[in-house]
Amino acid sequence: LAHGIVFYFDDFLFPYLRSAIGLNLKFAIYNLIIFKFCSVVSLLEIINMEMDISWLSRTSLLIGEERLRSLTQKHVMVVGLGGVGSFAAEFIARSGIGKMTIIDGDVVDPTNRNRQLPALATNHGVSKALIMEERLKAINPELQLNVVKEFVNPEMVKQQLSYDPDYVIDAIDSLTPKITFLKLAYESKVKVVSSMGAGAKLDPTKLQVVDISKTFNCPFAQQVRKMLKQHEIRKGIKVVFSPENPIKESLMLTDGKNFKKSAYGTISYLPAVFGAVAASVVIRDLIGEKI
């Protein structure tokens, strides 16, 4: 369009002004037209890209519009959309984050219905990532959402981390892919908060946010620490964990599907609280609050 304006000037107006102005002035006018037009277009693009935050008026009232708008410019990745990750992803979306990546290759199983946000009696066998995609976009239609319907593997993780997320929530509940992800995230120096075990426990008031090296009374965290040490990683990963004594009788051996050889019993609310705490770490850190 800018060049069309210039052509109009050249074909119709310039002949009449040929005797009055020189070539230098002609090109100066060309440049002025293009510069002004591009400036207007850039301004319109910025206006169009700015997320509508009117639905976040209660959040703005709490943290202020400036910090809220800063959240709309952030990219948060949630890996694992089970009992912890599904709730964490929803809380992140409801905070006004502008861009998200969600990753999970699993489908809904009937046993998920006691604790997982996507799981209903009507959607057994459906991709958790697909269900969460529809839900998050229904919460915020302007959300830039990248959906990865895959289980964690090194190549995929490297690719996703290359997109420079501002924060990552690790809600993977199987040890091998969890260690794969944490190792690569640690090496890439991306900010991570990782969920430890929500199984075999009942008390949501016991949850803490600490460095991985400070965890105790959590069999899952113990295994994570042990496997990370094999990669020379002993500290430097922020985690959500519960020091509540685990109910060991709730342990169940499994068939090893999806890298899980065992599982603990779970209660409906506790994984959601883990997800809420993880989401709170991300949001508070991104707006400059002390964790």
What is each residue range found by the language model?
Residues 1, 9-13, 17, 23-25, ...:
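Short hydrophobic targeting helices and cationic amphipathic motifs
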Residues 44, 49-76, 110:
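N-terminal charged helix/coil linker that caps or initiates catalytic domains
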Residues 50, 161-167, 172-177, 187, ...:
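Glycine-rich phosphate/adenylate-binding loop
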Residues 84:
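Hydrophobic/small residue at the entry helix of a nucleotide-binding pocket
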Residues 94-99:
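Conserved S-adenosyl-L-methionine
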Residues 104-139:
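Glycine-rich phosphate-binding loop and adjoining beta1-alpha1-beta2 segment
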Residues 149-156:
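Conserved SAM/SAH-binding loop
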